[in-house]
């Protein structure tokens, strides 16, 4: 949490959104006016679900590593992430649960056996794209988003126990963070992304949100560093540098 020297006018809000889009070309940039005033804004790399006609696409990301400006070092980081037993286990939990949620809703579902490594500007991620065909054409993109959310990537697993633990252990309310943002039209088509790397802005008050998954084998210092890297998305767009003290 911090305060700006002055509130964000409409022009600056548009500039902020433009900066986020320019610097995060591989994901989804969003800004949602809040009923209580202010705006919820961010840039997320993660597609929760897309539904166009009977085709369903889901692309969970789980398992991450900060990139390097040195090309050789950057390639090594990507290879190390792909070979990481801890990160592969974290990713598998998410994919298994997402597939379990989708199968009752799909006539067919293709689940690749292994993830791939994809890059954003700041991080490498393990990524798996699941593609299905709807069993019932009346199932909308919003229905699918509600069936999938929250995934283990943002809530943990088993879901009910993890949700209870979050309520007991996290010293703050997540608000809209780790929810989903997107659209659904009258035909049921739509696209929803996981609301990550974001901020709630009310006049001069700003609250940033970012996080990392914790599984057996996680190193607290590494997860803290990963979270700090994710904060850079909003910090740099706000013109506040890229470090978290």
Regions found by a protein language model. Name each.
Residues 135-245:
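Conserved hydrophobic core element of enzyme catalytic domains
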Residues 2, 101, 234:
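Short alpha-helical functional segments enriched in proximate histidine and acidic residues
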Residues 1, 83, 87, 216-223:
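Alpha-helix N-cap/helix-initiation motif
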């Amino acid at each position: 949490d911090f305060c700006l020297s002055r509130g964000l006018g409409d022009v600056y809000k548009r500039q902020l959104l433009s900066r986020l889009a320019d610097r995060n070309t591989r994901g989804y940039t969003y800004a949602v006016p809040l009923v209580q005033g202010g705006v919820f804004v961010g840039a997320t790399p993660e597609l929760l679900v897309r539904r166009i006609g009977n085709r369903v696409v889901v692309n969970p990301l789980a398992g991450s590593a900060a990139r390097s400006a040195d090309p050789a070092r950057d390639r090594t980081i990507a290879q190390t992430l792909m070979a990481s037993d801890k990160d592969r286990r974290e990713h598998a939990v998410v994919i298994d649960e997402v597939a379990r949620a989708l199968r009752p809703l799909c006539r067919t579902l293709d689940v690749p056996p292994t993830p791939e490594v994809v890059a954003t500007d700041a991080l490498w991620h393990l990524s798996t794209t699941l593609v299905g065909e709807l069993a019932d054409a009346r199932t909308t993109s919003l229905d699918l988003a509600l069936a999938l959310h929250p995934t283990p990537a943002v809530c943990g697993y088993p879901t009910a126990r993890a949700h209870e633990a979050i309520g007991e252990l996290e010293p703050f309310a997540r608000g809209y963070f780790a929810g989903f943002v997107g659209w659904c039209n009258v035909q049921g088509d739509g696209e929803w992304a996981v609301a990550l790397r974001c901020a709630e802005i009310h006049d001069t008050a700003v609250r940033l949100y970012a996080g990392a998954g914790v599984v057996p084998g996680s190193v607290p210092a590494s997860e803290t560093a990963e979270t700090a890297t994710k904060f850079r998305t909003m910090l740099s767009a706000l013109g506040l540098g890229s470090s978290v003290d």
